């Protein structure tokens, strides 16, 4: 898959969570911060990244940079996704189902952030397994990577879109 040039997109950022971590050394504890950030253009492009630094703003900046490097294109069918999918990462699973227009984004915390920035307006989701934000974000991204348009599926099966949809 071709890399998406983030500089050509008008991106919005959303900090999913900030975590303070401690390294225990001889003289006590050394604190640093990790920030999970999601970026997207609201039009099918989205990315997630993790930044770590001694200060919160620096961790967020690094997270944004990482998210821009990990951008993906989400095939949308109007305001929803093209088909049902389940993303998995670690112990986290996210089930995503297309929804009728006007349903809204039915998703919790980290999953909602990704879907809104990807431009999905109507979707049903269920988070299964862990509720660790990092695993939920990565599971959602894995699921969105697996999405295919009806045209792609038809081409892979050697059929026309009409044959496929009946």
Curated annotation (Swiss-Prot):
One of its GO terms (biological process) is translation. Keywords: Ribonucleoprotein, Ribosomal protein, RNA-binding, rRNA-binding. It comes from the Bacteria. Residues 11-74 form the S5 DRBM domain. InterPro entries: Ribosomal_Su5_D2-typ_SF, Ribosomal_uS5, Ribosomal_uS5_bac-type, Ribosomal_uS5_C, Ribosomal_uS5_N, Ribosomal_uS5_N_CS, Ribsml_uS5_D2-typ_fold_subgr. GO terms for cellular component: small ribosomal subunit. One of its GO terms (molecular function) is structural constituent of ribosome. Part of the 30S ribosomal subunit. Contacts proteins S4 and S8. Belongs to the universal ribosomal protein uS5 family. The N-terminal domain interacts with the head of the 30S subunit; the C-terminal domain interacts with the body and contacts protein S4. The interaction surface between S4 and S5 is involved in control of translational fidelity. With S4 and S12 plays an important role in translational accuracy. Located at the back of the 30S subunit body where it stabilizes the conformation of the head with respect to the body. PANTHER family: MITOCHONDRIAL RIBOSOMAL PROTEIN S5. This is Small ribosomal subunit protein uS5. The gene is rpsE.
């Amino acid at each position: 898959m071709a890399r998406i040039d983030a500089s050509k997109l008008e991106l919005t950022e959303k900090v999913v969570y900030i975590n303070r971590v401690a390294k225990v050394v001889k003289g006590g504890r050394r604190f640093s911060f990790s920030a999970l950030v999601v970026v997207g253009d609201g039009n099918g492009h989205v990315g997630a990244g993790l930044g770590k630094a001694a200060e919160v703003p620096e961790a967020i900046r690094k997270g944004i940079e990482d998210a821009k490097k990990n951008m993906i294109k989400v095939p949308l069918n109007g305001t929803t996704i093209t088909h049902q999918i389940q993303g998995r990462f670690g112990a986290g699973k996210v089930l995503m189902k297309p929804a009728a227009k006007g349903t809204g984004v039915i998703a919790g915390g980290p999953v909602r952030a990704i879907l809104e920035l990807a431009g999905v307006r109507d979707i049903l989701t269920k988070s299964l397994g862990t509720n660790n934000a990092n695993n939920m974000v990565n599971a959602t991204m894995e699921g969105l990577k697996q999405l295919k348009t009806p045209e792609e599926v038809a081409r892979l099966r050697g059929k026309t879109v009409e044959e496929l949809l009946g």
